[in-house]
Amino acid sequence: FYKHAEKTFSFEVMEAALNDYITDLDSLDARLQMRLSYPARVRSLRSGLDGFQYYDIALELVETGGARRKFMHLDYVYSSTCPCSLELSEHARSARGQLATPHSQRSVARLSVEVMPGDCLWFEDLIELARRAVPTETQVMVKREDEQAFAELNAANPIFVEDAARLFCEQLLGDPRIGDFRVIASHQESLHSHDAVSVLTEGETFASDSIDPKLFHTLIHGR
């Protein structure tokens, strides 16, 4: 592994390292997963400022029976406003003149996708697919005008967790570079004492009758 340490990180470098492991260990099957925090410059909504958003990403290579497959995993952090709560807040204002605010919360979508052989899918591509699906990504640089713009964006895109999962799936299904995938959407409720979670899969790769009991705890992003 260390002889590849100075190379620019890519699936190709991972493949070279995996080949070395297979040769050195005389192994039939092998798996290599690399996790990283990827910095991407993101512009604020209204003030024109920008800063770095850090994305939890993992690349994975799996070889079984002589067949090699590539996977990418992304945690996309966004804000979700409850559609029901939004309507109730508006009703309180219009019916009783009572100021009310809808509940919203930090939410996380973990997108796990298979990259089709011969195709190029990179971090920015998967991040952009997530943004297209649910545009209320948490912000990096925030002035008052950005906070107002974010409030407007959330009000224009209220969403239940099931609908968020469907929107992510819609984007992934529409990209020919992506094969099997799994979407886990977790809305970490500010109203309820439990989180709302939705899981959708496409294909057999991520389908399972059992889920790791610690999986959902890893979706907490305290940043």
Model-derived features: positions:
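N-terminal intrinsically disordered, cationic/polar leader segments
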Residues: F1-R223
